[in-house]
Amino acid sequence: MTGIWDVRITDTSLRDGSHHKRHQFIKEEVGAIVAALDAAGVPVIEVTHGDGLGGSSFNYGFSKTSEQELIKLAAQTAKEAKIAFLMLPGVGTKEDIKEAQDNGGSICRIATHCTEADVSIQHLGLARELGLETVGFLMMAHTIAPEKLAAQARIMADAGCQCVYVVDSAGALVLDGVADRVAALVAELGEDAQVGFHGHENLGLGVANSVEAVRAGAKQIDGSVRRFGAGAGNAPVEALIGVFDKIGVKTGIDFFDIADAAEDVVRPAMPAECLLDRNALIMGYSGVYSSFLKHAVRQSERYGVPAHQLLHRAGQRKLIGGQEDQLIDIALEIKREQESGQVASRR
């Protein structure tokens, strides 16, 4: 930490927001957003395909512009901010990490399901060997108990991870659920690694949960300007800064500048506002990975079944990131029920 901030903010609008934009960012948008966030004092800006390095694919959706080109542009544009990139083992490769560093990325964020931290070991090791700052993401953190999450965090820290995040991928955690998990990681990791929190707005608690995380000891917090992220979006950075200013938590980000960036630069690049609607609420309530939203809407249109029912059943099946294709099976199941006159259950 430096004297500039008590908590370091990472803006994920150019990565998590890629889900909302169906990975269709163009260089002009990325350059303008990076410049505005950098000028406002945002210390870390994450840039990649929504599903991380190598995510551009038939399964996840193809990028309009190469993520490596966007990382390079972001690094060339930012005067002070560091450029982070996300990587999911099994989606991206070690070579992708090296290329991202060559293009100016300096923070490598490795994401795994919350029970599978062991698959990150070699990638975290490589990142440290390359001299990159390392962050670990334990996704779908609501699905396991705090002590089990802490044990997974220990695996990442021992592999060289410098900050392990409690990642509320579904926006399903509620206040104490965040505080308990962050506190468990802080107790387990001590001085070995920092703890971070990444929230979503699917139950409308992105900002409140982030405050709980900081009070429990988190030193890094994610958000997206204008909630530009998957599902109902992430905690809006401009609101986070306003709240943190009010409670005396230093971030180094100027509230008025980030509010201007959200309104004047980021919003025009968004296809629509990220909404807390029925689909998003169902994801938070049922514990569904936030990036499932656009996939569910697509299958809803294709098969003529309600997206919210698809999402609810995805939660019942406890699907995780990477299992988006199972939404097709669920859609066909609901379609058969409709044709036979069955009424879909809400429970």
Swiss-Prot record:
Q: Where does the entry annotate site (Transition state stabilizer)? A: 15
Gene3D superfamilies for this protein: 1.10.8.60, Aldolase class I
Is S-adenosyl-L-methionine one of the keywords? no
Q: Which GO terms describe its molecular function?
A: 2-isopropylmalate synthase activity; 4-hydroxy-2-oxovalerate aldolase activity; manganese ion binding
Catalytic residues, chain numbering? 19 (proton acceptor)
Query: Biological process GO terms, please?
Result: catabolic process; L-leucine biosynthetic process
- Where does the Pyruvate carboxyltransferase domain lie? 7-259
Q: Which reaction does it catalyse?
A: (S)-4-hydroxy-2-oxopentanoate = acetaldehyde + pyruvate
One Pfam family named in its UniProt record: DmpG_comm
The UniProt keywords, alphabetically, are:
Aromatic hydrocarbons catabolism, Lyase, Manganese, Metal-binding
Question: What are the EC numbers?
Answer: 4.1.3.39
Cystine connections = none
Which PANTHER family did the record assign?
A: 2-ISOPROPYLMALATE SYNTHASE 1, CHLOROPLASTIC-RELATED, HOMOCITRATE SYNTHASE-RELATED
Q: What is this protein called?
A: 4-hydroxy-2-oxovalerate aldolase 2
Source species of the chain? Mycobacterium ulcerans (strain Agy99)
